[in-house]
């Protein structure tokens, strides 16, 4: 095998296959739908971010720690981050009884067969959101909110 052939074969393993992407997209759709049902008007938006949204996520066969990051934007975050992490964990345990669900600050992890999903509670930064629409509070250390 020459170097060019090896590199082509290797690089093809670094890209999600269509069926893997389809499984992930379906899971994202179901998670979003279930979040809307479970929380109703308590949440403002559900956003996929990170490597999957940038189309740089690696297949799990290459990177066992590959995950899909999902930000759950709550309408009002008047409590501490742990309050919202607990709510997301309760959601995950309710809908994903046969999956591994755990908290891993600042997220709640749902381990499905094909990939891990990390749910991050958040809320818009009040007072700035009219100027910077993509500014959010997310959990930080010491159970405090961080601006991003």
How would you name each of these model-derived features?
Residues 1-65, 77-84, 108:
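N-terminal regions immediately upstream of nucleotidyltransferase
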Residues 69:
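Acidic Asp/Glu-based divalent-cation binding sites
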Residues 72-76:
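Short beta-strand-to-loop capping motifs
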